[in-house]
Amino acid sequence: MFSKILTKVIGSRNDRTLRKLRKIVDQINKLEPQFESLQDEELKAKTIEFRARLEQGEDLDNLLPEAFATVREASKRLYGMRHFDVQMIGGMVLNDSQIAEMRTGEGKTLTATLPCYLNALTGKGVHVVTVNDYLAKRDAETNRELFEFLGMTVGVNVPNMPPQEKKQAYLCDILYGTNNEFGFDYLRDNMAFRAEDRVQRERYFAVVDEVDSILIDEARTPLIISGPAEDSSELYIRINTLIPQLVKQDEEDSEEYRGEGHYTLDEKGKQTHLTENGQEFVEQLLKDAGLMEEDDTLYSPANISLLHHINAALRAHVLFEKDVDYIVKDDEVIIVDEHTGRTMPGRRWSEGLHQAVEAKEGVKIQNENQTLASITFQNFFRLYEKLSGMTGTADTEAFEFQSIYGLDTVVIPTNRPMARNDMGDLVYMTEAEKFAAIIEDIKGCSERGQPVLVGTVSIEKSELLSNALKKAKIKHNVLNAKFHEQEADIVANAGTASAVTIATNMAGRGTDIVLGGSWQADVAKLSDPTEEQIQAVKAKWKEAHDAVLASGGLHIIGTERHESRRIDNQLRGRAGRQGDAGSSRFYLSMEDALMRIFASDRVSGMMKKLGMEEGEAIEHPWVTKAIENAQRKVEGRNFDIRKQLLEYDDVANDQRKVVYELRDELMNVDDISEMIGYNRQEVLEGLFGQYIPPQSLEEMWDVEGLTTRLRADFDLDLPLQEWLDNDDKLHEDNLREKIIEAAVQVYKEKEESVGESVLRNFEKAVMLQTLDGLWKEHLAAMDHLRQGIHLRGYAQKNPKQEYKRESFELFEGLLDTLKFDVVSILSKVRVQQQEDVERMEEQRRLQAEEAARRQQLQHQNAENQLDDGEGAEEAHSPMVREERKVGRNEPCPCGSGKKYKQCHGKI
């Protein structure tokens, strides 16, 4: 009560914001006569002046009144369109990184030109994000003349553009494109191998059109780039035939038989290592099999992949036993958990080991799709320094915009008062009765020349209604979201007298329905029209426009309520643009999905008590209230799901940032020798600690084991025991230092023999290639972890905390493995000359091109991302419970760890 009184006295937050912005609008309006007096060249020169002032340190907000006045004046001269004061307010809201809720027909496209121009003055680039390619191209072409007049460059970012064109587009001052394409470009840039292959620059300012659709409706669906894991089935099979010829080195008499065995075993670490003799023997086998050139060696840079396959096959044969480590069932290798003895279907060993075991057992080698990169829209758009958005319906989701993105919502008043008549809902017992009433309503409108837009929740329902209209001999158009270009034409003419248009909920967004039709479309049909012809078309349109207004304007019919009130408001918002007359009504039945699940008992009980006849409807504020409460429940549930997805993705996002920053650093420097040196020291110290524990007695040292590992992993043949025997003063610390010094010296000799620049290039290539391979495997491991983490709730553990803890352990493992593998490869691989590095680079480039050709870009269904059993927000799929009902005292399926009655059972 008190808060209501306070709001009346001082106004709401929205009112206070508008009052503050109106003062700036007054300043802009005072500048108008001054800007009207400028010549075209003087107006164009304003851009150069503003940029110079910014370079001298002037604040962007100080330039706002003059910049907005410049854009308004240019628009008046080029298009004959003057920005309304409310559009100026909308532009300021967008510039302040907020969401502007502007009703349909209030000119969002023109409003966006104001903050786009202002922020493009910085030279950092502005991205205008739309829901489809058609709107991106249309808006870019609509505003191109205005921006180019003011000295700005305009680009369009659409799928399948050549990389060079895309790179040029990103250099434009203002770039229009879809949310998917901006997101995929970001992921592709972070998979590039050379700095010049990247297309994006910094993410500075984004204006998201239809922001509710992009940041809320699509927020549960991550962007994923996936591709088939490297298809080397044939190579696994061929190498599998070579491995049985290898002989294990005799352990007991290793000194005596050294050189005769081909490999050594480390059963504790589940690793194998080729001996020097083994390496030569394998090289000969590979040459005989035609897998390696005659003058080549196993450790040359181009053969890193071959070495990887040999190691995997050797481990599969000598360390992994059938019916101990795995079983073969239904032509598939299934891992056995070493701790529990249970099988783990769906899990696969990494680093090619699983494929090697499949080759060994003669079953089909599976090359499953692998996630190469992924990100959610929440985390992608939060990368922008400034983010803003506009839509006709944001206020119902204001809390989510604020809590997830930190964006406040400002409701912009309409330029003219709203004149639309929103009538109460009519509820029928059956769908057949409801459709019959809709047909009658459409007939009545057609007879008096009133255009009708019918909104359906799915293509299936729109086809049902279309068939009913055909039977009633009522001419109509059906809109679906498949063909955006035709869609715009149909929507543009949906306001002509007696027009009947059926559209699914999202179809036609972004195109205004003008009463009387679009005179611009009629002019476009004329070839080289004269001014006289244009005026005749306008006069004809004016007559049609006035006739439609007299019939009551556009009438909106909703065939059922959507899960979200916001989608209902979007449908209503198609009518009553810019103060035009219009009306709306929703027709519901007890068979509708929303009514059946959430409101059926109460409302159907009320209808039965009233003793309703067939074809009779109920219209009461209580019914509308019950439906809105049901919608609030669904909105709350969907918000919880999006929030939960974000909490999980935030964990992956922190790791993604670290990996992408490291990649960025590697791409932008030529010399990473300091990083390699630091890693070498860390890896060798870690290995030393495994065999010679800190502050331990010499009797506890495993000198022989350390000697073997140094030889096998780093090609370091060091006589450690001899050093210790000959020097009594040699203790733990200086032995460690001596090993590191020896490793540095060997590497220095390698550098002197091949040349510094050759080795620097090779270091960078190895680091990038190893990082990318491990990151792909890490993403797969994170997917596996996500899929089963909700089960921790049954063990009274918090799944989110467990996910954070285990994913951190996985990531630490990735970083440790990266350091170890890079140091090991650089120590063992023999680089002869620059050609070796170029061969490796060429091989990698060809693989990357092939992978890019086979890549799949997915805007993945959220159902695969969440383990809470909740379905995706798709209006056309009826909400039917497929799984058994969750008991009140059982753990909640959302994975919170709470009981169902204390979590989602409350809703």
Swiss-Prot record:
Group of enzyme by EC: translocase
Key words of the record: ATP-binding, Cell inner membrane, Cell membrane, Cytoplasm, Membrane, Metal-binding, Nucleotide-binding, Protein transport, Translocase, Translocation, Transport, Zinc
CDD domains membership: DEXDc_SecA (cd17928), SF2_C_secA (cd18803)
Cofactor binding note of this UniProt entry: May bind 1 zinc ion per subunit.
GO CC terms of this entry: cell envelope Sec protein transport complex; cytosol; plasma membrane
Residues at which ATP binds: 87, 105-109, 512
Gene3D superfamilies referenced in this protein's UniProt entry, alphabetically: Helical scaffold and wing domains of SecA (1.10.3060.10), P-loop containing nucleotide triphosphate hydrolases (3.40.50.300), SecA, preprotein cross-linking domain (3.90.1440.10)
Region (Disordered): 834-907
Record PROSITE patterns: SECA, SECA_MOTOR_DEAD
Required cofactor(s): Zn(2+)
Chief localization: membrane
Protein location: Cell inner membrane; Cytoplasm
Ranges annotated as biased composition (Basic and acidic residues): 836-853, 873-888
List of residues binding Zn(2+): 892, 894, 903-904
HAMAP family, sorted: SecA
Assembly description: Monomer and homodimer. Part of the essential Sec protein translocation apparatus which comprises SecA, SecYEG and auxiliary proteins SecDF-YajC and YidC.
Name of the molecule in the record: Protein translocase subunit SecA
Lineage, broadest ranks: Bacteria, Pseudomonadati, Pseudomonadota, Gammaproteobacteria, Vibrionales
Gene label: secA
